[in-house]
Amino acid sequence: MRKLLLSLAMVTGIATSFAQQKVLVLYYSENGTTKTVAEELQKQLGADIEAVEAVEAYTGDFQATIQRGNKERESGQWPAIKAIKKNIKDYDIIFLGYPIWFGTYAMPIATLVKENDFAGKTIVPFCTFGSGGLNTSSEALKKALPKANIKQGYGVRTARVAAAAKELDRFLIENGYKEGEVAPLPAYGELVPVTPEDSAVFSAACSTYQFPLGTPKMVGKRETETTTDYKFTVKSTGMNGEESASTVYVTVGKEEGAQPEFTEVVR
C-alpha cells in the first residue's frame, strides 16, 4: 500500500508540473481516424490543437496511398505541407499524431519534422494503425529529432478506435499528463506453450485481419478488473522461407458476450 501511495504521489506531482506547461496536439490524419484520437487528447488535456495538411491531399484510398507513398519513398521527395499556424517555440510538450504507413509515421509528418525545429521539446507520439507501428515510428522519431525528448507514446488499431477514450485516460494519468488515479496493470505471466483454448482466442481475434499473422506458439496472460489479456509469441515463415517471430497482443473483456480483440503486433 505504501508503494502504491508513493506512486500516486509521484504521479500527482508530475501532473501538477505538467499543468504548468504549454501543450500542443499536432497531428496528420488522412481519413479522420487519427483526428478522432487527436480530438480526444485535446479534450482530455485542454491543449491547443492543429492539423498538419498536405498541399496535395491524399485521396484516402488505400491502394492509391500505397502507390503514391512508394513513389515518394523511392524518390526521397516528401510531400509539401501547408505552413502550420501555431508557433512550435511557444510549446513545451507536443503530442504528435499520425497514421502508420510503411511501418512508420506518415509521409506528411516526415516533412513536418524535417522543416521545423523541435529541439528541446518533449514529444509524445500517438498513432493509429492496422496492426502496429508505435515502437518503430517512435524509434524513427528519435533518429529524426535527436535534440528532442521523445517519450513513451500511445497507439491504437483503427478497428479499435472506439476504445481510445478509455485507454487515453489511463495513458495520460499513468504518465503524469493529467491528474487522477488508476490501479497499476499487473505484469504478464511467464510464457508457456499455447493450449487449444488459447489458440481459439488467437484465431477469434486475428482471423479477420487482412494479412496472416502466423501461428501462436507461446503465451503469457494477465488478469485485470475488466479484461483477460494475452501476449502471444507468434512464428511465421516469409516468402524467402525464413522463420520470424513477433508478439501479438489480444484482449478479452469480462462483460457478457465480449469477443477477443487483436490490439497490436510488435515485430
Residue ranges and their predicted role:
Residues 1-20:
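Bacterial Sec-dependent N-terminal signal peptides
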Residues 20-96, 103-105, 203-208, 214-221, ...:
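N-terminal beta1-alpha1-beta2 submodule of the flavodoxin-like/Rossmannoid cofactor-binding fold
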Residues 30-37, 41, 105-109, 137, ...:
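Stable alpha-helical elements in mature extracytoplasmic
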Residues 65-149:
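Helix-loop-strand module that forms the ligand-binding subsite of alpha/beta enzymes
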Residues 148, 192-196, 244-267:
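Compact beta-sheet-dominated globular domain cores
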Residues 157-180:
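C-terminal helix of von Willebrand factor
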Residues 174-210:
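N-terminal trafficking/processing presequences and adjacent post-cleavage segments
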Residues 226-234:
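A short hydrophobic beta-strand element
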